[in-house]
Regions:
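Alpha-helix capping and helix-loop boundary segments enriched in small/acidic/polar residues
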Residues: 31-39, 65-70
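Glycine-rich "HGGG/HGxG" loop immediately N-terminal to the catalytic nucleophile
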Residues: 22-33, 49, 74
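Short beta-to-alpha linker loops that shape the active-site pocket of alpha/beta-hydrolase fold enzymes
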Residues: 14, 19-23
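Accessory cap/linker subdomain of secreted extracellular hydrolases
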Residues: 99-186
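Alpha/beta-hydrolase active-site loop
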Residues: 33-55
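Primarily recognizes the serine-hydrolase "nucleophile elbow" in alpha/beta-hydrolase
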Residues: 50-121
């Protein structure tokens, strides 16, 4: 990703990163609606308009959305909601590995883990699946505060999943992985 961004900058493009809703929110009361297409799309279109307003004539009125993973999904959403940047000309989207088809990802990952004989790889896959699921649940709790992690995860995993409201992907994944290793060794 850094190489791609560097290439865009070298070619003279302005690169703007969205400020996704709920990330870094100081009170901790507003959760990030992880993988909520409209929220992500609005973050991108708002960022594009703000950058153009700030830079004025130093920036073109043409824009493209490019993203990877969650950003890939956000870029697809920006295409859907491009009209929000009404005074600018939307030129297209490049979505790299957008988050999509969760059923396939989760069932495929579980099948892969089930066939894996190497414990490290098995736990790596399962911890990753649990991490994404927990982040999705955290995002769903923003509009649905009565949704409980125990409705999705069994105890004690539900307690780890609650950390999705404050931890980033890597830290949360390590917590799931550590618990899985402890369970495997018991």
């Amino acid at each position: 990703i850094k190489t791609m961004i560097g290439g865009f900058l070298q070619a003279g493009y302005i690169v703007v990163a969205p400020d996704y809703e709920g990330l870094g929110e100081p009170s901790g009361k507003e959760l990030h609606p992880f993988l909520n297409l409209k929220s992500e799309a609005y973050s991108i279109t708002d960022a594009v308009v703000a950058a153009r307003n700030y830079l004025g004539s130093q920036a073109s009125n043409q824009w493209v959305a490019v993203g990877h993973s969650q950003g890939g999904q956000a870029a697809l959403g920006a295409a859907q909601y491009a009209a929000r940047a009404s005074k600018m000309t939307y030129k297209g989207t490049v979505a790299l590995a957008p988050a999509s088809n969760f059923n396939l990802i989760l069932t495929g990952g579980e099948q892969q883990a089930g066939q894996e004989t190497n414990l490290d790889k098995k736990i790596g896959t399962l911890a990753s699946l649990d991490t994404f699921t927990a982040l999705i649940v955290a995002g769903l709790r923003n509009p649905n505060p009565n949704l409980q992690y125990s409705q999705i995860f069994k105890t004690p995993t539900d307690e780890i999943a609650k950390n999705a409201e404050t931890d980033c992907y890597d830290v949360l994944g390590q917590k799931f992985g550590t618990a899985m290793y402890a369970y495997a060794q018991s």
